[in-house]
């Protein structure tokens, strides 16, 4: 699942070789990052089996909920296009959608600030990660936050967004990523 786990298995003599597939689906640079010792930057597989194993036999392209480019590399999905005219971008919501919007905007050269009404990022994924045996869903947010930090995305926690704040901040663009409310059983 992660480079440290693979190294540990080798060091303890449990195996002579480690094959990692889903880890490289989640992060195409998995091996290069492991070799460079950049394990904190590695996007870890969530073990969800949704878009990789879950698509087997369905005659659909390979995908990964952690990596929107997986299976679409040739289409240019997620390709970085640095803008010659950077804009200020306000992202409202720090769930997975908001974090991914922030990452994409920042990679393309824009100045990004994420506003989150809660004291921490994650949105509904925090609920999914609390289900027994599904804690790895929290890795998605951890991975996205690590990428946001690396890129220099700014965060404002415990700040709800209202029209007055948008007028005060005067961003060039606003991305609303406030997610959904959990369904009542």
Where are these regions (language model features)?
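Glycine-rich, histidine-containing beta strand-loop boundary motifs that form or position
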Residues: 22, 159, 178
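Glycine-/small-residue-rich beta->alpha transition segments that form the dinucleotide
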Residues: 171-173, 177-184
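Beta1-alpha1 glycine-rich phosphate/pyrophosphate-binding loop at the start
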Residues: 91-158, 183-185
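Flavin-dependent oxidoreductase catalytic cores
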Residues: 1-92, 96-107, 111-112, 120, ...
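Short, structured coil segments at secondary-structure junctions
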Residues: 13-14, 151, 170
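Short amphipathic alpha-helix with an adjacent loop that forms part of the alpha/beta core around
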Residues: 163-169
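Short, hinge-like loop/turn segments at secondary-structure boundaries
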Residues: 13, 35-38, 130-134, 174
